[in-house]
Amino acid sequence: MSFGKFFNTAVSAWMSQEGPNSDIVLSSRIRLARNIVDFRFPTLFSSEEAKQIVALFERAFVHRPYGEAGRFELLKMSELQPIEKRVLVEKHLISPHLAEDSPFGACLLSENEEISIMINEEDHIRIQCLFPGLQLAEALEAASELDDWIEGHVNYAFDERLGYLTSCPTNVGTGLRASVMMHLPALVLTQQINRIIPAINQLGLVVRGTYGEGSEALGNIFQISNQITLGKSEEDIVADLHTIVEQLIAQERAARQALVKTLGIQLEDKVFRSYGILANCRVIDSKEAAQCLSDVRLGIDLGYIKNVSRNILNELMILTQPGFLQQYAGGVLRPEERDVRRAALIRERLRMETRRKMEGDER
């Protein structure tokens, strides 16, 4: 396997698949925080200990195939260019913290990019499993099986009373973070999102932007995750989040239908104006691109736009990020240069998709 595929392919294999409710839920993620006995936490350990942790996982797992995921590749942060690290963040394969603040960090990646094991982030390892659509239970099962497999080769820091020990007290217990990425344009347009977010927070869940803590909800994409890890089982945490997500899906669908009834041609006009901008613009920044892509995605889901597939929108949401634009350019770009390249890339990708659809219809 070539490292290049991780940096040059925008859409991971799992992202190109349709999952349950994938018109609204882009992805489901389970993340497990674990630490190894006899080593200090990453917040306290020495550079030598950090290197020992990486070496431990390299020896134990790099050449050991794991089921359908196959072999893992080890990517060391110290050996990657800043642009390459940014690409991995944009694909949700590593966290911004690992990319920016972990000089001795690393990541084990499966070939299909469904599994990512971050090493020396806030904890010794963070196991991540990503699934398309609303598949929290399936992602939990996959993460738990992987967790058991890893535990067969290393000894976890575990307390009979507290559970899994972690650097941050908010992760102690199960060490589990379950999250879903949701596209909620109708709840934003109707401003219902302003009352929904505080209500979700009161239920012990947290709402963040596209790239987690501190990030903006670009393109009306929100990340919903659990906050409590202690005193509940993994299954209960996931079930509670699943229930809330199903309610959000129902509210978003109802809001979409209400917009169709109340706005009618104005909503259709908004969608096609955004499509027109994407198909013809010469300069576009990431924020405007994300908003237009959101409008077009809504138009596809409502049946207004028929010559573009939802998968192309998923691809463009990542391709148009600063890291990917610079990776394709082969070097650092100034913001204004990125805006020109972003516009050209979107125009060309939409042209290719329209041509492909037309050729398919003629057959």
From Swiss-Prot:
Keywords assigned by UniProt, alphabetized: Allosteric enzyme, ATP-binding, Kinase, Nucleotide-binding, Transferase
Binding residue positions for ATP: 27-31, 92, 126, 177-181, 208-213
Positions of short motif RDXXRA motif of the pArg binding pocket involved in allosteric regulation: 338-343
Catalytic reaction(s) noted: L-arginyl-[protein] + ATP = N(omega)-phospho-L-arginyl-[protein] + ADP + H(+)
Alphabetized InterPro entries for the sequence: Arg_Kinase (IPR023660), ATP-guanido_PTrfase (IPR000749), ATP-guanido_PTrfase_AS (IPR022415), ATP-guanido_PTrfase_cat (IPR022414), Gln_synth/guanido_kin_cat_dom (IPR014746)
GO cellular component: extracellular space
UniProt EC number: 2.7.14.1
Pfam families: ATP-gua_Ptrans
Regulation: Appears to be allosterically activated by the binding of pArg-containing polypeptides to the pArg-binding pocket localized in the C-terminal domain of McsB.
GO biological process: phosphocreatine biosynthetic process
PROSITE patterns linked: PHOSPHAGEN_KINASE, PHOSPHAGEN_KINASE_C
Domain Phosphagen kinase C-terminal: 24-255
Molecular function terms, GO-annotated: ATP binding; creatine kinase activity; protein kinase activity
Role of this protein: Catalyzes the specific phosphorylation of arginine residues in a large number of proteins. Is part of the bacterial stress response system, where it is involved in regulating the global heat shock repressor CtsR; phosphorylates arginine residues in the winged helix-turn-helix domain of CtsR, thereby preventing its binding to DNA and consequently inducing the expression of repressed genes.
Quaternary context: Homodimer. Dimerization is important for full catalytic activity.
Entry text on domains: In the 3D-structure the McsB dimer adopts a flat 'domino tile' shape, with the two active sites opening on the same side. Individual subunits are composed of the N-terminal catalytic, ATP:guanido phosphotransferase domain (PD, residues 1-263) and the C-terminal dimerization domain (DD, residues 264-355), which are linearly organized in a PD-DD-DD*-PD* manner (asterisk denotes the partner protomer). The PhK-like catalytic phosphotransferase domain is structurally adapted to target protein substrates.
Family classification: Belongs to the ATP:guanido phosphotransferase family.
The protein's name: Protein-arginine kinase
Taxonomic source organism: Geobacillus stearothermophilus
